[in-house]
């Protein structure tokens, strides 16, 4: 295909000369980075697309499987595993011979011959292969370890239909009944073959067949019977990672003015690609595909195309050739991938949507709504790219982190500590329509947007952590982004049940309204504590309760079963909320066993982590221990999920009941033991208790003593509980500000020499729904109170800030609030939505579109509703509109400040702090437009005495002031003011150039999340105003 496409690859630039092609400029920071990469990467592999060639003959094939799917062919179901060998060869393994099955209890008195029954089923239902009778135990309820007979029904297809027939009583001589082990084909196969997500599989040499008539683009394509697979548990040498190829890409579109790009109309003009191998730090492919010419970029290839169609087809060829295992990017799932597919469709490129690993499978876009209690509801687009894993960093970060803003800019600033230039989509078209130099600028911008997701992937360890989560829970990697928490527990449950001959009932998920009491919170004794507060934490509280008391489906009793099995009180535990569970000597529960294995494996991973020296292996082990911890904690949540596969409120409510009891017991034990009557100099006091921790005031002033006592108290109280429940001493807060339940701040100490950090919970330093001023003020106030121990200084700072706010001295960037403009209908009018509508009426070209974040400030208007008072910050700057400072004081600052100062100063003094004499002076900017000003006729006045000037006087002064000799001083002041403003603007402009990575190019950035953007805009306006004033001085005759 490639020879027919008119493309040119620009020559690699001379790396020694650090100049652009026009010789005008030094390279930007980002280009220096590209240069470093080029010099660091081995020459022979740099910019090489192809995978390493295959050896002439194979022995055993071992590969790490990445993606798995089931497929149907001529009435049979099979599985496909895609993977990569240690040498970097791509593999497609077709697994044959496995037949899906489910269980159904054999009815009492079943006297039919099994062969007759099987023949009847085969004649009635399409797809039945065979039926066996086997002895199993149901997971639900203690059964005295007695197994009962079950039909094991094997079906090549139509398994859901057959299962429903048994459940609905459509099978001859069998009443409606519960069926067991309802799980999809792929997971059933993986569980039975002991394959976990991202694990290694070996295909023995004489067991697999090489497929010559290949359906995939993989280097090795083979078939094997499932019984011949060798699956390696992820431990020891099999914890390794294959050299996965990770492609990060970004596209740029040339949109029309005022319209967000639409694939039917707006072309894709550039695609930047960066490919890196997992475990390596430098990408070995860096290129940009462009429409039209483009000047060269250091250390990167440019592929120029005359037509967009040629560029897209060449990019598709690039994907097939470089053969990425993982495709990443930022918002690629909902924008970039669907956009290129829709654009190719609009251009009639029928051969384009085939860049997966299956040659004849077309890439198609589906809409999916993902909803879970943990992650909320999100609408996403899903594209099948068979054999290639997709990891959209935006979706990953939205799932794992709570941030103020999720733009790539904000996220990069938060995690990587660097900003990037943010070019508005309307400017992109101007750059594309300019010269090859402006297109080069766009290409550098696009390439950086492809680099950043790779940097985030490395920093946040997404691939490593998700790999370990797939290995620990057993599910395919793709499930981790597309499914909720439950599937992970189900997978572990089925694996353990298979070992123990236990089957799991297929219960209808009905979502009961039954509620159970949550965790205890000991009422906080609010206040400011200038003494050390020790924190005692239960290690893995809920998992350890389930293990200590053997809480499980398989150990659950009721009064009838206690009587039927002749159990005594020594045989079972009665939980605080009145449920019964048998002791582990009679039956060790499945859930406690799973938890025991997870926590033991975590201890081992943490021990290995301490010994490991290789940085990549350390990351893998850290990801593993994290995955094990998360998995252990999610088992409890699974039992309490009323809309779930296997809800059991007896387990979940017993866990929280034990938890409540233990927090109370800890409080009483500590206060009883560390008391004056027990020979201690102070009475210890538990000032707050949360789900799994208690805060203790021992009374001592010095940190070291409190740390020793904390350690001692944790060990002492642990002896009062059943194994493996353990109380641990982790930290001391000193000083500590306890505001309310789940709201506190303090300095966090783990060693007496120096505090580790300032720790806050539920306080506005971490809240996302307020302006930057609140965050900055609260952070500063806490620094003064906690780090400097200087409350009067904090009070002075607050008074000064409030005075500055009321007198219009706070920079506008501090007052900007941003919210996402989404398509959902809001029940009440929203400030940012109403503003977006007003902006559209003013200028459709610059108005926010769906998906954008709308930045606004609250201004003084005739209306009293906030949605009437929201305004675009740029419009406010241009027209000098007055800010509603009372809104910012009353609605944004007052409550957070009250929460901090009332525990310290009391209500009266806090009120004085927020409403004292420093709040009497209010200055408001005079608007330039609107209201009566529309009818006012503006006349020029003398800059000295404010006397109106005659029409023919275009100068700055009236004749009287000229006669009095005021000119020179006033002119000098005007010049020095101009000098100050130009200097300020120049500093801000340089800061923006430094951020964009070049000190010579014009600043195009319009990042509304960045405070400098508004400062720069205001400074530019101030310089312009002052220049107009100086023109008047030029026209003054003096």
UniProtKB/Swiss-Prot annotation:
<feature type="binding site">
    <location>
        <position position="942"/>
    </location>
    <ligand>
        <name>Zn(2+)</name>
    </ligand>
</feature>
<dbReference type="GO" id="GO:0006297">
    <property type="term" value="P:nucleotide-excision repair, DNA gap filling"/>
</dbReference>
<dbReference type="InterPro" id="IPR042087">
    <property type="entry name" value="DNA_pol_B_thumb"/>
</dbReference>
<dbReference type="InterPro" id="IPR006133">
    <property type="entry name" value="DNA-dir_DNA_pol_B_exonuc"/>
</dbReference>
<dbReference type="GO" id="GO:0008270">
    <property type="term" value="F:zinc ion binding"/>
</dbReference>
<keyword id="KW-0808">Transferase</keyword>
<dbReference type="GO" id="GO:0006278">
    <property type="term" value="P:RNA-templated DNA biosynthetic process"/>
</dbReference>
<dbReference type="GO" id="GO:0043137">
    <property type="term" value="P:DNA replication, removal of RNA primer"/>
</dbReference>
<keyword id="KW-0479">Metal-binding</keyword>
<dbReference type="GO" id="GO:0043625">
    <property type="term" value="C:delta DNA polymerase complex"/>
</dbReference>
<dbReference type="Pfam" id="PF03104">
    <property type="entry name" value="DNA_pol_B_exo1"/>
</dbReference>
<keyword id="KW-0863">Zinc-finger</keyword>
<comment type="function">
    <text>This polymerase possesses two enzymatic activities: DNA synthesis (polymerase) and an exonucleolytic activity that degrades single-stranded DNA in the 3'- to 5'-direction.</text>
</comment>
<dbReference type="GO" id="GO:0006303">
    <property type="term" value="P:double-strand break repair via nonhomologous end joining"/>
</dbReference>
<feature type="binding site">
    <location>
        <position position="992"/>
    </location>
    <ligand>
        <name>[4Fe-4S] cluster</name>
    </ligand>
</feature>
<feature type="binding site">
    <location>
        <position position="1010"/>
    </location>
    <ligand>
        <name>[4Fe-4S] cluster</name>
    </ligand>
</feature>
<feature type="binding site">
    <location>
        <position position="1005"/>
    </location>
    <ligand>
        <name>[4Fe-4S] cluster</name>
    </ligand>
</feature>
<keyword id="KW-0235">DNA replication</keyword>
<comment type="similarity">
    <text>Belongs to the DNA polymerase type-B family.</text>
</comment>
<keyword id="KW-0378">Hydrolase</keyword>
<keyword id="KW-0408">Iron</keyword>
<dbReference type="InterPro" id="IPR006134">
    <property type="entry name" value="DNA-dir_DNA_pol_B_multi_dom"/>
</dbReference>
<dbReference type="InterPro" id="IPR017964">
    <property type="entry name" value="DNA-dir_DNA_pol_B_CS"/>
</dbReference>
<dbReference type="InterPro" id="IPR023211">
    <property type="entry name" value="DNA_pol_palm_dom_sf"/>
</dbReference>
<dbReference type="Pfam" id="PF14260">
    <property type="entry name" value="zf-C4pol"/>
</dbReference>
<keyword id="KW-0548">Nucleotidyltransferase</keyword>
<dbReference type="GO" id="GO:0060090">
    <property type="term" value="F:molecular adaptor activity"/>
</dbReference>
<dbReference type="InterPro" id="IPR012337">
    <property type="entry name" value="RNaseH-like_sf"/>
</dbReference>
<keyword id="KW-0238">DNA-binding</keyword>
<feature type="binding site">
    <location>
        <position position="958"/>
    </location>
    <ligand>
        <name>Zn(2+)</name>
    </ligand>
</feature>
<protein>
    <recommendedName>
        <fullName>DNA polymerase delta catalytic subunit</fullName>
        <ecNumber>2.7.7.7</ecNumber>
    </recommendedName>
</protein>
<dbReference type="GO" id="GO:0006287">
    <property type="term" value="P:base-excision repair, gap-filling"/>
</dbReference>
<feature type="binding site">
    <location>
        <position position="945"/>
    </location>
    <ligand>
        <name>Zn(2+)</name>
    </ligand>
</feature>
<dbReference type="GO" id="GO:0051539">
    <property type="term" value="F:4 iron, 4 sulfur cluster binding"/>
</dbReference>
<dbReference type="Pfam" id="PF00136">
    <property type="entry name" value="DNA_pol_B"/>
</dbReference>
<feature type="region of interest" description="Disordered">
    <location>
        <begin position="1"/>
        <end position="29"/>
    </location>
</feature>
<keyword id="KW-0004">4Fe-4S</keyword>
<keyword id="KW-0269">Exonuclease</keyword>
<keyword id="KW-0411">Iron-sulfur</keyword>
<dbReference type="GO" id="GO:0003677">
    <property type="term" value="F:DNA binding"/>
</dbReference>
<feature type="zinc finger region" description="CysA-type">
    <location>
        <begin position="942"/>
        <end position="961"/>
    </location>
</feature>
<dbReference type="InterPro" id="IPR036397">
    <property type="entry name" value="RNaseH_sf"/>
</dbReference>
